[in-house]
């Protein structure tokens, strides 16, 4: 909307990422680009979308560290955006990153992030002479400060271990939820497609059957010191847009999904407590 491009909403598939067939149905001659959200760290099937010959922007806010067919997310020809917000696998507290293989795009982005200046702060400070910048475009300040950047860079050394710990914790949750699903109407939300050759386990979510009121489940769990929250939000239903579009899988996650407490250092004892409290709540509400 901010750049004159009204969004066209599309559904997600069972993996929580944009549903190729639904997008194809909505593409028109006016389609300028497709934004592919690598939701919860699950990559989209890029090869399928490549066939459409439409510019793509990858939203990998949750995807840092995951791989698509043996290549890290972001290793494509498209613009790719990342978030390093506090709950991400690699964090700088706040902030993010944009990557591109296009030199002209990169130069434009560097200018846009720094008030629209023609000279980067690094170029100006390293110059052996007076370097006068000019402002070629109207923009604002989107630069990441040096200290948060250093914090993120330092984590790269231990990032593989971070993913290993998350994988171990995620697989343990999977085992426990599968056991619960034999007696309760719940299912694992973290379904991983075969083309995802490395999953970063950004978070752990599950989907409750419609017999349960998800909000009540979350409320009771939180009162019992289980810091869960509701799942993926349906952005087309937010007040900023409030569009009437039929997106059934999106609404399933929106209405019945929840995130369990999840981080690399979570202990087995903590996970067992979460599962036991969840079991108690499901017993209480069914």
PLM region descriptions:
Residues 12, 86, 262:
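Short, conserved catalytic or interaction motifs in soluble domains
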Residues 15, 64, 89, 235-237:
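Positions that flank functional sites
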Residues 8, 56-57, 81, 187-189, ...:
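Structural detector of well-ordered beta-strand residues that form the stable sheet scaffold
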Residues 58-92, 107, 131-136:
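Conserved active-site segment immediately N-terminal to the catalytic lysine
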Residues 19-25, 33-37, 67, 103-286:
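PLP-dependent aminotransferase class I/II
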